Amino acid sequence: MGTMTIDGRKVEFTDEKNVLTVIRNAGINIPTLCYHSEVSTFGACRLCTVEDDRGKTFASCSEQPRDGMVIYTNSGRIKKYRKLIVELLLAAHCRDCTTCVKSGECILQELAHRLGVRDIRFENTREQHEIDDSSPSIIRDPNKCILCGNCV
């Protein structure tokens, strides 16, 4: 058992496996794309990055909670960092959002809106791949892949 300070608020924790779980249990919503509580930590998306009282940033999904930690989940620096991550993900993503079947239900689209991403300032230099529709039940479009690990 221990106590952390999250955004100025004291929060007690018991045996949570990572800082992200403590933060979410405290009612704070932090975005993630790759995290699943029942699967081993992947830590690829970095959207759950937080900042400690010394200015160190880290992925909250892969850091164990320690008594006395002071965490900031939504500082100006962290907001800019998350926005940049989404911009980079979109830059390497296909640009068919308006015609995509997931438009309006897309987690990446929702994050971009939530974080204020209006334009993609980076050029898309990603190579285009063929769609794999060889299965009658699954269509795999590698051009939509954002390397989150959810499909694995």
Language-model regions: role of each:
Residues G8-D67, G76-Y81:
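N-terminal cofactor/phosphate-binding cores enriched in small/glycine residues
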Residues M1-R9:
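Eukaryote-biased recognition of intrinsically disordered, low-complexity regulatory segments
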